[in-house]
Amino acid sequence: MDKKGDWLIYDKKGNVIPVAQGTDEDKSVTGNGLPKFTGSMTHNFTYKNFDLSVAFRGAAGFDIFNVHDFYFGLQSMTTNQLTTAYSKNAHITTGKNVITDYFIEPGDYLKIDNVTLGYTMNLNKKYIEKIRLFGTANNLYTFTKFT
């Protein structure tokens, strides 16, 4: 950004110019929205009549365009909650919103996807040999650097 708060970009020759002087030839493809790696794993544990299952899921090697920061500015600003839903974009002081790589962030994540804890009771009744009680929680936590 320049001193007035306008975006600066690189033109096709590599020179820094104001965004208003940019042309279609100066645009370039930046980032990759498709993960290079995806994976998941499940761990099962048992002890006596208890059982525990923990499932993880993740992806790595991709980028995300942070639309919230692009349109609304920093999400952490709460000084104007009663008048508007979001603060003015602190990154853009003049001109229009411009899509730049400034708003591209790493999309890598590891998620605790599912945890199930169960207990099996041996009843040894005529029609019911065992009964299992369990509780499950989904989408427990996501480890990521994406804001």
Residue ranges and their predicted role:
Residues D2, N15, A59-L140, F146:
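Extracytoplasmic gating/loop element in the C-terminal half of outer-membrane beta-barrel translocons
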Residues M1-S53, T94-G107, I112-N114, G118-L123:
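Outer-membrane beta-barrel transmembrane strand signature
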Residues P35, L140-Y141:
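A composition-driven signal for long, intrinsically disordered, charge-rich low-complexity tracts
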